[in-house]
Amino acid sequence: MILGTSSRLAHSIRPCSSADRLMWITPDRVFYAGLLGNPSAHVRGAMVIYVALEDLIHVNVAQGGWHTSEVAVVQPYVPHQVACDARHVVALYIEPETVDIARLPGRLATGNGVIDAPEFSAHVRGCHARMIRSGRDFDLRPEDFDPMFFGRNLPRRNIDPRIAQVLDRIKRDPSAPASAEECANMVKLSFSRFLHLFKAEVGVPFRSFRTWRRARSLLHYVNQSRNLAQVALEIGYPDSTHFSHSIRQSYGLKPRDIFAGSRKLRLIGDGLPNAALN
């Protein structure tokens, strides 16, 4: 399939209610169907595919002007703004260090803005409807994500084993104050060599990757009735000011607005990162 062929799960744009809100989180992918809010321009560390759920979506990528479609692709770490005349949208996150960008189909590899992919849009809405109908009886595993939405596994990126070890450490515990120096020592590289190799293998600086994974870990908490200051400390922010600033940079919304819009959001997935389970 991959943004192209028709699907037996195809569904049209339709009205949604709070019962349709869910988020499936895996270590390397996210499927979100829920409230959009009114996000300002922001930068996410994942490739994001926005899909129309109730109405067409409007996207402004890198201040290139507003464009409208059923599907938009935004590459990792590219500033953008998204809007919709309805309340609900779908967003799929693909963590870029897990895929070989050069081997992705053209519109995924090079798309940066709206694309013409009505069959894919209808298929994603069909997958969403199936998850809603199945409720808690739908047994989903991380390895099911790509085949469900794209028809096959996306091509994996080959990462230097030393950098892969660091990536795994950060993903397992994004709240840990792991410095570049510590990680360099862990994999027996000099500090400068580690920073160079990390950027060459992952595509972004170490600090940018760590910042995104910490902000991403917030997704595991958003439907909980928790004190935001406590959440900030749990996921590794030194104080509420840093927390609010980082989350607004990553999502275009204040933390309190994200939590307010997620009260009726159903989360499915593998649970919290290690640190949050302690």
Regions found by a protein language model. Give the residues of each.
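A short, N-terminal "cap"/entry segment at the start of jelly-roll beta-barrel domains
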Residues: 1-22, 126-131
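N-terminal regulatory/effector-sensing and dimerization cores
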Residues: 16-109
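Short, Lys/Arg-enriched N-terminal segment that forms or immediately precedes the first helix
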Residues: 31-34, 146-155, 195-203
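Aromatic/histidine-rich interaction motifs
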Residues: 104-133
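A short, Lys/Arg-enriched amphipathic alpha-helix from helix-turn-helix/homeodomain DNA-binding modules
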Residues: 117-125, 146-178, 184-187, 208-226
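Terminal helix-turn-helix DNA-binding modules in bacterial transcription factors
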Residues: 177, 181, 200-238, 261-278
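Short coil turns linking two alpha-helices in DNA-binding domains
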Residues: 190-191, 238-239
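Short hydrophobic/aromatic patch on the recognition helix
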Residues: 194, 198, 242-243, 247
